[in-house]
Amino acid sequence: MSEQNNTEMTFQIQRIYTKDISFEAPNAPHVFQKDWQPEVKLDLDTASTQLADDVYEVVLRVTVTASLGEETAFLCEVQQGGIFSIAGIEGTQMAHCLGAYCPNILFPYARECITSMVSRGTFPQLNLAPVNFDALFMNYLQQQAGEGTEEHQDA
């Protein structure tokens, strides 16, 4: 057997850290006197960078915007980072690991940070629902495949 066939998949968390946080309440204090029926918008984004052989940084960016009508009550952004050792996988499996599995690990940390900042801003508690990063990753792959098909049709 070749050495490649004996390569076992390994995954290890080296570090989880807060890379950047931001909280803005541009319409405070008068926003506190309004009836609290916000429209809450959640945006997610991930990025990964190879730091060394089998070592990757994954950053999950979570942005929450709460609006009352046309006014922004608060805007909260967290970039939660992680450094992971990943070996023994390639291609689509590696893309899935970096684009779904690692963000799944990082999300609870980002959610806790956002909840804390919103609370410190004296807004009512914000509970973010769990996110299915596997489904988001599959949607991303389908979009990429669709764009590739369209490019071939245009050629």
Curated annotation (Swiss-Prot):
Single GO term (MF): unfolded protein binding
Gene3D superfamilies, per database record: SecB-like (3.10.420.10)
Name of the protein in question: Protein-export protein SecB
An annotated GO BP: protein tetramerization
NCBIfam families: PRK05751.1-1, PRK05751.1-4, secB
Keyword entries, A-Z: Chaperone, Cytoplasm, Protein transport, Translocation, Transport
Signal peptide: none
Keyword Protein transport: yes
Localization (cell): Cytoplasm
Gene Ontology terms: cellular component: cytoplasm
Source organism, top-level taxon: Bacteria
Role of this protein: One of the proteins required for the normal export of preproteins out of the cell cytoplasm. It is a molecular chaperone that binds to a subset of precursor proteins, maintaining them in a translocation-competent state. It also specifically binds to its receptor SecA.
Gene label: secB
